[in-house]
Amino acid sequence: MSTPTPPSSGRPKQPFPSSPGSSRRSKILGILVAIIAIAIFIVPVVVSTYTDFAWFRSVDYQGVFMNVIVTRLVLFVVFGLIGALISWLAAFLAYRARPDEIESLGTSSPLAEYRPLIRRNMRPFLVGIPLFVGVITGMIVQSNWRSVLLFLNGSNFGVHDPQFDKDLGFYAFNLPFLQMLVSTFSVLLILAFVINGIGHYLLGSITTGNPRVGEKASISTNARRQLAVIAGVWMLLKAVGYWFDRYGLLTRSHETFTGASYTDINAVLPAQIVLLVISIFVAAMFFVTIVLRDLRIPALAVALMVGSSLTVGLAWPAMLEQFSVNPNRAEKEREYIARNIEATRYAYGIGDDKVTYDRDWGASGDAASKEQKKAVADDSATLSNVRLLDPEVLTPTFTQQQQLRNFYGFPDELAIDRYEVDGKMRDFVVAARELNPNTLDGNQNDWINRHTVYTHGNGFVAAPSRKVDEVARDVGSARGGYPVYTVADLQSMQSGKQGGELKLDVKQPRIYFGPVIASSNQNNSDYAIVGNTEGEPLEYDTDASNYTYTGTGGVDVSNYFNRLMFSAHFESMNMLLTDRIGEGSKILYERDPRERVHKVAPWLTTDSKTYPIVIDGRVKWVVDGYTTLNNLPYSERIGLTDSTADAINPDGVSETQVVDNEVGYIRNSVKAVVDAYDGSVDLYAFDEADPVLKAWRGAFPGVVKPRSEISKELEDHLRYPEDMFKVQRELIAKYHVSDPGVFFQNDSFWSVPTDPTAPQDRQDNAQPPYYVVAADPETNKPSFQLITPFRGLRREFLAAHMSVGSDPDNYGKINVRVLPTGTQTLGPNQAQDTMMSSDEIARERTLLKGTNDLTNGNLLTLPVGDGQILYVEPVYSQRSGQDSAFPKLLRVLVSYNGQVGYAPTIAEALDQVGIKTSSTTDIQEIDGSVVDPTKDGGSGNKGDKGKDADKDKKSKDEQSSDAKGAAGKSDDKGTDTAPEQRVRDAMDKVNKTRESGTFEEFGKALDELDKAVQDLQSER
């Protein structure tokens, strides 16, 4: 039944009164919306802030957290209020200047009928818009907290720029902050102009008029004055911006160099002064409009500004560039290129005080002469330390032989460090045996097991890089070619065999922190809950025992509130409900050493590599920290991600670990040490003269310890960092040139060679630098170095060789051996091609490829003797198609003076290229009798046997007779079939003719071997 409609009374309808029930529902709905908003926006912030503070307190760096939080909060509040106040004033003044009589505004405007409604509802706009602008302003400015702290704590460099004679500290610390202020207030004034103008239009102070009904556009006096003041102040800020832009010219990038060019100094710089004056004039014209009603005055001034910008700012510099500079660029830019060279060398630590150039190195002497070969053979500092173990290749070998359990593992790339053995420096391939969360299997992945049982790794593993357990003359044998391990872990502690030849004394071998343990492929699962003292130990330690963490690191979760907060942080309800958390329980997270360092020192860029060392009876991680600046006058800017990419690390340093990806200044100012057991972080000032580090130490007092606190034991294990070296080598490839004219021509530049031994998909990437022990360029004594070759620009011939010392007495000394111009010394790719095209090598690789996977190790470019280059490359083999197979050292390739050596040992390979080294005993890679490295408690420790290696080793003939044929196959009785015997006989003949026969005899022997292998394969 329909309800009759009441007759209209002509009066406006009144709204229905709301019922008490609907009002209650509205309140409940409002409360629910508020709760949801709090849960979505507020709770995550509270949880994140609380857990972050708890983490910083657990590592005793809460001062860093509070300093950053307070700085950001103050910036947010101050600039948020400023932004809100400016926008509020713009809106309020427009509202206050509204016309009193709306009717007088006319009715033709589309806003005419809405203006009464707008006037009655201005309060939300007067509050909402300023609040929004203030929040956005505060958020943007607080993200620049680093610039603010540097401005407040920066000091002088003691070096001045060549154009304005200002200390570099002005550009590093003051200019970025001042430019941030100018840009912030410029944007706020633009917003204020827009808000004020729209407000006047909406409220009727500005009308557009309607010619069809005879209404003219109009602007009230108050509106004109307010907009003129805002525009005038903005123009004054524009003038200030032009003043600061002058300094920005010194960091401009050009095709050939960085910094102000001839055109910049002689055209752009004067133009900016002219535009600065015009900006002040335009501002004055806007202010004049406050008194005069004629808007044509500021309009003409703005037209003058635009015209001047086009003519003086653009046309004049372009004409000067085209008609004066381009025809004579080499001479015109000479002074400015010289500035660029000097500034770049200073900014990257590659000046004459840091780099020594050995010009025309190797110019005298013939590499084939007896004198040169003797000089090379006598270079025992290099030849007795040739590294045969490639840390990039041997991770599977370390894993198979030293893993112990499926949940342990090693990083994809092992590390190189040096230790003293019997009074001599030796380099070792080193790694910590970490827990690998990605190899947990089956029920091991249960939440209880993953986070409370499998919590830590076990031990430190090292292998001398220059030798293996036994010569692998027979590729088919299970013997030989494997590292000789020195292990310090729980098992070796219990057996009393810890340390081996390194005499390591590790009192705490458990690894709770490391890059592998933090590499979980499950999101938000990098944590372990440890330390529960209630009941029996829960953490897996050995097959016979469990363990309870007793370290000082970690955040207490024994109380329910912390459990609740971390349960929310890691989105894990199990943390709330489990009974595995009790008295003394702690949660360990942020377990990657690099991430820990970056978190406690957020102003540091961290190196992409970290490596374990053993000092003070504990395993610790060393992380290199860099202080950087985005730019510096005349210094070339370089991208850290691109410049640190190579064949091993094609992605370069992670952007999450950098403060500035594009930098114009860098110093390795901090060495950080992270304890692998308790996660404690110690930062040491390594370059105390660095002005940027001084500023950060002022901002965070007490965070970085003085260099004097670096112990002798730690100093002996510090390495020159790879990423720093990569950046420097990319720049030295250009900036070794001192003459601006030659620099402009580009024909004397070098380039980093690509890696010929990399996998096919990475062979276009740069060859990585390598750590080696070799003869020091100055003293000729063994020193731990980082080395890299250079090739000519767009040429493959070797142009130079760069090395840097890492020992305490020569740390950071860069030596560049520059080959004479015009020489044709083979570069790395040419040497690789020469070695791979050798008939003997090609034949053997062809024979082996059917059953074995061959891997070329790192190609080392080693300066030897009095100016000669020796290439050394290990070759590894592993069985094809077998998941359990892992690489072993099979052969050693060498290239010297165009000759190729290929043998099971470095001594034999050197002998084949005519180097009769007196260091044969030192570099012999036999270590006595063979021991299965997977036995002896899993440690594979053979260090004690290694001491008597020279006494116990077999002769080459004995090794050869013990070895099985390269393609032979033994049955259970040790007898061979006829084809197999023919292969053995052919192999013997190849070996004999290689040592004493002619090339013709050697070729025939290879043919016989090839036929014997084919017969064997046919029979099978």
From Swiss-Prot:
InterPro entries: UPF0182. Its main location: membrane. Residues 942-961, 969-998 have a biased composition (Basic and acidic residues). Pfam families: UPF0182. The chain crosses the membrane at residues 28-48, 73-93, 125-145, 175-195, 227-247, 272-292, 300-320. Residues 1-18 have a biased composition (Pro residues). It is found in: Cell membrane. Residues 1-23, 924-998 are annotated as: Disordered. It comes from the Bacteria. GO terms for cellular component: extracellular region; plasma membrane. The keyword Transmembrane applies. Keywords: Cell membrane, Membrane, Transmembrane, Transmembrane helix. It is a multi-pass membrane protein. The keyword Membrane applies. Belongs to the UPF0182 family. HAMAP family: UPF0182. This is UPF0182 protein jk1603. The lineage of its organism: Bacteria, Bacillati, Actinomycetota, Actinomycetes, Mycobacteriales.
